Amino acid sequence: MHNERYDTYVKKDTEKPVISTDPIHVYTDSKPNFKSYIDVTDNLDLNPKIKIDSSKVKTKKEGSYKLTVTATDRSGNKAKKKINVVVEDPTKVVYLTFDDGPSENTDKVLKILKKYDAKATFFVTGNNQKYNDSIRKAEKQGNTIALHTYTHDYATVYSSTEAYFNDLQQISDMVKQITGKAPKYIRFPGGSSNMVSANYSQGIMSKLDSMVHERGYEYFDWNCSSGDAASNSVPAQTIVDNSTNCNYDQIMLLFHDSSPKTSTVEALPAIIENYKSRGYVFKAISDDTPIFHHGVNN
Protein backbone atom coordinates (compact mmCIF):
# COMPACT_ATOMS: atom_id res chain seq x y z
CA MET A 1 0.00 0.00 0.00
CA HIS A 2 1.42 3.35 -1.03
CA ASN A 3 0.86 6.57 0.81
CA GLU A 4 0.27 9.14 -1.91
CA ARG A 5 0.74 12.80 -1.25
CA TYR A 6 -1.22 15.44 -3.06
CA ASP A 7 -0.17 19.07 -2.99
CA THR A 8 -2.82 21.71 -3.52
CA TYR A 9 -1.85 24.95 -5.18
CA VAL A 10 -4.15 27.95 -4.90
CA LYS A 11 -3.69 30.53 -7.61
CA LYS A 12 -4.00 34.04 -6.23
CA ASP A 13 -6.72 36.12 -7.89
CA THR A 14 -5.30 39.52 -8.83
CA GLU A 15 -7.78 40.49 -11.52
CA LYS A 16 -10.02 43.48 -10.80
CA PRO A 17 -13.74 43.50 -11.57
CA VAL A 18 -14.81 45.27 -14.76
CA ILE A 19 -17.31 48.14 -14.49
CA SER A 20 -19.22 49.06 -17.64
CA THR A 21 -22.11 51.33 -18.52
CA ASP A 22 -23.23 53.81 -21.13
CA PRO A 23 -23.52 57.50 -20.14
CA ILE A 24 -26.51 57.86 -17.82
CA HIS A 25 -29.34 60.28 -18.61
CA VAL A 26 -31.90 61.11 -15.91
CA TYR A 27 -34.54 63.79 -15.46
CA THR A 28 -34.53 66.63 -12.97
CA ASP A 29 -36.27 65.87 -9.66
CA SER A 30 -36.13 62.13 -10.36
CA LYS A 31 -34.85 59.50 -7.92
CA PRO A 32 -32.83 57.24 -10.21
CA ASN A 33 -31.68 53.77 -9.24
CA PHE A 34 -28.11 54.18 -10.47
CA LYS A 35 -27.28 50.54 -9.77
CA SER A 36 -29.69 49.47 -12.51
CA TYR A 37 -27.56 51.32 -15.08
CA ILE A 38 -24.29 49.63 -14.10
CA ASP A 39 -22.92 46.23 -15.09
CA VAL A 40 -20.07 44.68 -13.08
CA THR A 41 -18.35 41.44 -14.07
CA ASP A 42 -15.48 39.53 -12.51
CA ASN A 43 -13.37 36.58 -13.63
CA LEU A 44 -14.20 34.52 -10.50
CA ASP A 45 -16.71 36.32 -8.31
CA LEU A 46 -20.28 36.22 -9.63
CA ASN A 47 -21.43 38.88 -7.18
CA PRO A 48 -18.80 41.54 -6.54
CA LYS A 49 -19.72 44.18 -3.98
CA ILE A 50 -20.77 47.44 -5.60
CA LYS A 51 -20.57 50.83 -3.92
CA ILE A 52 -22.01 53.90 -5.61
CA ASP A 53 -21.14 57.45 -4.60
CA SER A 54 -23.74 59.79 -6.10
CA SER A 55 -23.03 62.73 -3.78
CA LYS A 56 -21.79 64.85 -6.69
CA VAL A 57 -24.95 64.29 -8.77
CA LYS A 58 -27.47 67.12 -8.33
CA THR A 59 -30.78 65.92 -9.70
CA LYS A 60 -32.41 69.25 -8.86
CA LYS A 61 -30.38 71.03 -11.54
CA GLU A 62 -29.66 70.31 -15.20
CA GLY A 63 -26.04 69.56 -16.00
CA SER A 64 -23.33 66.92 -16.32
CA TYR A 65 -22.09 65.26 -13.15
CA LYS A 66 -19.75 62.44 -12.14
CA LEU A 67 -20.91 59.28 -10.39
CA THR A 68 -18.20 57.16 -8.72
CA VAL A 69 -18.63 53.38 -8.78
CA THR A 70 -16.39 51.05 -6.76
CA ALA A 71 -16.52 47.28 -7.25
CA THR A 72 -14.72 44.82 -4.96
CA ASP A 73 -14.49 41.07 -5.51
CA ARG A 74 -14.13 38.41 -2.79
CA SER A 75 -10.34 38.43 -3.22
CA GLY A 76 -10.22 42.09 -2.36
CA ASN A 77 -9.48 43.31 -5.87
CA LYS A 78 -10.99 46.73 -6.29
CA ALA A 79 -11.99 48.69 -9.40
CA LYS A 80 -13.14 52.30 -9.45
CA LYS A 81 -14.75 54.21 -12.31
CA LYS A 82 -16.22 57.68 -12.76
CA ILE A 83 -19.34 57.67 -14.92
CA ASN A 84 -20.93 60.68 -16.59
CA VAL A 85 -24.51 61.43 -15.50
CA VAL A 86 -26.51 63.96 -17.51
CA VAL A 87 -29.47 65.49 -15.69
CA GLU A 88 -32.03 66.76 -18.18
CA ASP A 89 -35.21 68.79 -17.90
CA PRO A 90 -38.14 66.64 -19.11
CA THR A 91 -39.81 69.76 -20.46
CA LYS A 92 -40.34 69.72 -24.22
CA VAL A 93 -37.83 72.06 -25.85
CA VAL A 94 -37.52 73.84 -29.18
CA TYR A 95 -34.07 75.07 -30.14
CA LEU A 96 -34.62 77.85 -32.66
CA THR A 97 -31.50 78.14 -34.83
CA PHE A 98 -30.72 80.80 -37.43
CA ASP A 99 -28.05 80.38 -40.10
CA ASP A 100 -26.33 82.85 -42.46
CA GLY A 101 -26.79 86.08 -40.49
CA PRO A 102 -26.31 88.71 -39.36
CA SER A 103 -28.44 90.97 -41.54
CA GLU A 104 -31.12 93.60 -41.16
CA ASN A 105 -33.46 90.71 -40.27
CA THR A 106 -31.44 89.68 -37.20
CA ASP A 107 -32.59 92.64 -35.09
CA LYS A 108 -36.19 91.91 -36.11
CA VAL A 109 -35.77 88.32 -34.94
CA LEU A 110 -34.30 89.54 -31.65
CA LYS A 111 -37.31 91.78 -31.00
CA ILE A 112 -39.66 88.84 -31.53
CA LEU A 113 -37.60 86.59 -29.26
CA LYS A 114 -37.64 89.23 -26.53
CA LYS A 115 -41.40 89.69 -26.85
CA TYR A 116 -42.01 85.97 -26.31
CA ASP A 117 -39.21 85.46 -23.75
CA ALA A 118 -37.63 82.92 -26.10
CA LYS A 119 -33.96 82.13 -26.66
CA ALA A 120 -32.28 81.04 -29.87
CA THR A 121 -28.91 80.20 -31.40
CA PHE A 122 -27.32 82.13 -34.26
CA PHE A 123 -24.83 80.33 -36.52
CA VAL A 124 -23.18 83.40 -37.99
CA THR A 125 -21.12 84.17 -41.08
CA GLY A 126 -18.73 86.94 -42.11
CA ASN A 127 -20.70 87.97 -45.16
CA ASN A 128 -22.60 90.99 -43.86
CA GLN A 129 -20.34 92.60 -41.30
CA LYS A 130 -22.07 95.96 -41.26
CA TYR A 131 -24.68 94.20 -39.11
CA ASN A 132 -22.15 92.66 -36.70
CA ASP A 133 -23.54 94.71 -33.83
CA SER A 134 -26.57 92.42 -33.99
CA ILE A 135 -24.28 89.59 -32.90
CA ARG A 136 -23.38 91.57 -29.79
CA LYS A 137 -27.06 92.34 -29.12
CA ALA A 138 -28.06 88.70 -29.57
CA GLU A 139 -25.44 87.51 -27.11
CA LYS A 140 -26.32 90.21 -24.58
CA GLN A 141 -29.98 89.15 -24.81
CA GLY A 142 -29.07 85.64 -23.65
CA ASN A 143 -28.91 83.89 -26.99
CA THR A 144 -26.05 81.65 -28.10
CA ILE A 145 -23.64 82.76 -30.80
CA ALA A 146 -22.23 79.85 -32.78
CA LEU A 147 -20.08 79.46 -35.89
CA HIS A 148 -21.30 78.69 -39.40
CA THR A 149 -18.73 79.88 -41.94
CA TYR A 150 -16.83 83.04 -42.77
CA THR A 151 -17.37 82.94 -46.54
CA HIS A 152 -20.14 80.37 -47.13
CA ASP A 153 -18.36 79.61 -50.40
CA TYR A 154 -18.67 75.83 -50.73
CA ALA A 155 -15.89 75.62 -53.31
CA THR A 156 -13.48 77.28 -50.92
CA VAL A 157 -14.65 75.84 -47.60
CA TYR A 158 -14.77 72.24 -48.79
CA SER A 159 -11.69 72.26 -51.02
CA SER A 160 -9.68 70.63 -48.21
CA THR A 161 -9.75 70.11 -44.45
CA GLU A 162 -7.12 72.82 -44.14
CA ALA A 163 -9.33 75.25 -46.06
CA TYR A 164 -12.30 74.37 -43.85
CA PHE A 165 -10.42 75.12 -40.65
CA ASN A 166 -8.95 78.32 -42.08
CA ASP A 167 -12.49 79.51 -42.79
CA LEU A 168 -13.69 78.38 -39.35
CA GLN A 169 -10.83 80.21 -37.65
CA GLN A 170 -11.72 83.41 -39.50
CA ILE A 171 -15.32 83.38 -38.32
CA SER A 172 -14.21 82.41 -34.80
CA ASP A 173 -11.80 85.35 -34.69
CA MET A 174 -14.52 87.70 -35.92
CA VAL A 175 -16.98 86.60 -33.23
CA LYS A 176 -14.33 86.81 -30.53
CA GLN A 177 -13.66 90.43 -31.48
CA ILE A 178 -17.36 91.19 -30.99
CA THR A 179 -18.25 89.15 -27.89
CA GLY A 180 -14.88 88.40 -26.33
CA LYS A 181 -15.57 84.68 -26.66
CA ALA A 182 -14.54 82.06 -29.22
CA PRO A 183 -17.58 79.78 -29.69
CA LYS A 184 -17.19 76.00 -29.71
CA TYR A 185 -20.58 75.19 -31.26
CA ILE A 186 -20.61 74.98 -35.05
CA ARG A 187 -22.83 74.07 -37.97
CA PHE A 188 -21.32 72.86 -41.21
CA PRO A 189 -22.39 74.77 -44.35
CA GLY A 190 -25.12 72.53 -45.76
CA GLY A 191 -25.11 70.39 -42.62
CA SER A 192 -22.97 67.32 -41.96
CA SER A 193 -25.06 65.29 -44.43
CA ASN A 194 -24.41 67.63 -47.37
CA MET A 195 -23.34 66.16 -50.70
CA VAL A 196 -22.20 69.41 -52.30
CA SER A 197 -18.82 68.96 -50.58
CA ALA A 198 -18.20 65.87 -52.74
CA ASN A 199 -17.88 68.19 -55.73
CA TYR A 200 -14.72 69.62 -54.21
CA SER A 201 -13.20 66.92 -51.98
CA GLN A 202 -14.25 63.28 -51.75
CA GLY A 203 -14.72 62.06 -48.18
CA ILE A 204 -14.11 65.44 -46.57
CA MET A 205 -17.18 65.34 -44.31
CA SER A 206 -16.15 61.98 -42.86
CA LYS A 207 -12.77 63.50 -42.01
CA LEU A 208 -14.24 66.70 -40.58
CA ASP A 209 -16.73 64.76 -38.45
CA SER A 210 -13.88 63.55 -36.25
CA MET A 211 -11.46 66.45 -36.74
CA VAL A 212 -13.81 69.11 -35.35
CA HIS A 213 -14.25 67.06 -32.18
CA GLU A 214 -10.50 66.60 -31.85
CA ARG A 215 -10.18 70.39 -31.90
CA GLY A 216 -12.79 70.90 -29.18
CA TYR A 217 -15.84 71.80 -31.28
CA GLU A 218 -19.31 70.26 -31.31
CA TYR A 219 -21.46 70.48 -34.40
CA PHE A 220 -25.23 70.63 -34.56
CA ASP A 221 -27.50 69.66 -37.42
CA TRP A 222 -31.30 69.79 -37.10
CA ASN A 223 -34.30 67.46 -36.94
CA CYS A 224 -36.90 69.97 -38.16
CA SER A 225 -36.63 72.47 -41.00
CA SER A 226 -38.64 75.58 -41.77
CA GLY A 227 -37.93 75.09 -45.46
CA ASP A 228 -37.02 78.76 -45.80
CA ALA A 229 -33.86 77.83 -47.74
CA ALA A 230 -35.91 76.60 -50.70
CA SER A 231 -35.94 80.09 -52.20
CA ASN A 232 -35.82 83.76 -51.23
CA SER A 233 -39.60 84.06 -51.44
CA VAL A 234 -41.05 81.12 -49.52
CA PRO A 235 -44.50 82.23 -48.29
CA ALA A 236 -44.71 82.87 -44.55
CA GLN A 237 -47.58 80.41 -44.16
CA THR A 238 -45.51 77.67 -45.79
CA ILE A 239 -42.74 78.36 -43.30
CA VAL A 240 -45.25 78.21 -40.42
CA ASP A 241 -46.66 74.91 -41.69
CA ASN A 242 -43.23 73.33 -42.18
CA SER A 243 -41.93 74.54 -38.83
CA THR A 244 -44.88 73.40 -36.72
CA ASN A 245 -45.13 69.95 -38.27
CA CYS A 246 -42.64 68.40 -35.82
CA ASN A 247 -43.64 66.40 -32.76
CA TYR A 248 -40.37 65.45 -31.06
CA ASP A 249 -39.83 66.28 -27.40
CA GLN A 250 -36.54 67.94 -28.36
CA ILE A 251 -36.69 69.91 -31.60
CA MET A 252 -33.81 71.67 -33.32
CA LEU A 253 -35.44 73.92 -35.88
CA LEU A 254 -33.55 75.34 -38.86
CA PHE A 255 -34.16 78.91 -40.04
CA HIS A 256 -32.12 81.51 -41.90
CA ASP A 257 -31.84 85.19 -41.00
CA SER A 258 -29.95 86.46 -44.05
CA SER A 259 -31.17 89.56 -45.89
CA PRO A 260 -33.76 87.94 -48.21
CA LYS A 261 -35.53 86.01 -45.44
CA THR A 262 -38.24 88.54 -44.61
CA SER A 263 -40.95 85.88 -44.70
CA THR A 264 -39.07 83.95 -42.00
CA VAL A 265 -39.36 86.97 -39.74
CA GLU A 266 -43.03 87.27 -40.64
CA ALA A 267 -43.66 83.60 -39.79
CA LEU A 268 -41.75 83.49 -36.50
CA PRO A 269 -44.44 84.77 -34.07
CA ALA A 270 -46.99 82.19 -35.22
CA ILE A 271 -44.39 79.42 -34.91
CA ILE A 272 -43.46 80.41 -31.36
CA GLU A 273 -47.12 80.73 -30.35
CA ASN A 274 -47.89 77.29 -31.80
CA TYR A 275 -45.17 75.55 -29.83
CA LYS A 276 -45.94 77.47 -26.64
CA SER A 277 -49.54 76.28 -26.88
CA ARG A 278 -48.21 72.71 -27.08
CA GLY A 279 -46.17 73.05 -23.90
CA TYR A 280 -42.74 73.71 -25.36
CA VAL A 281 -40.11 76.12 -24.07
CA PHE A 282 -37.43 77.81 -26.18
CA LYS A 283 -33.78 77.41 -25.26
CA ALA A 284 -30.44 78.37 -26.74
CA ILE A 285 -27.82 75.69 -27.35
CA SER A 286 -25.63 74.96 -24.32
CA ASP A 287 -23.38 72.17 -23.07
CA ASP A 288 -26.50 70.37 -21.84
CA THR A 289 -28.24 70.38 -25.23
CA PRO A 290 -28.83 66.99 -26.88
CA ILE A 291 -26.58 66.44 -29.88
CA PHE A 292 -28.36 66.51 -33.24
CA HIS A 293 -26.29 64.84 -35.98
CA HIS A 294 -27.29 63.75 -39.46
CA GLY A 295 -25.67 60.78 -41.16
CA VAL A 296 -22.51 61.77 -43.02
CA ASN A 297 -22.82 61.09 -46.77
CA ASN A 298 -19.40 62.16 -48.02
Residue ranges and their predicted role:
Residues 5-11, 77-88:
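C-terminal edge beta-strand
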Residues 1-2, 69:
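Sec-dependent N-terminal signal peptides of Gram-positive bacterial secreted proteins and lipoproteins
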Residues 45-83:
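Serine/threonine-rich, repeat-prone extracellular segments and beta-strand-based repeat modules
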Residues 84-182, 274, 290-291:
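Active-site beta->alpha N-cap acidic-glycine motif
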Residues 130, 152-254, 258-276, 280, ...:
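Catalytic domains of cell-wall/extracellular-matrix polysaccharide-remodeling enzymes
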Residues 5-46:
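Solvent-exposed, low-complexity, repeat-rich "mucin-like" stalks and linkers
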Residues 97, 121-125, 146-148, 186-189, ...:
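A cross-family glycoside hydrolase active-site/sugar-binding cleft signature
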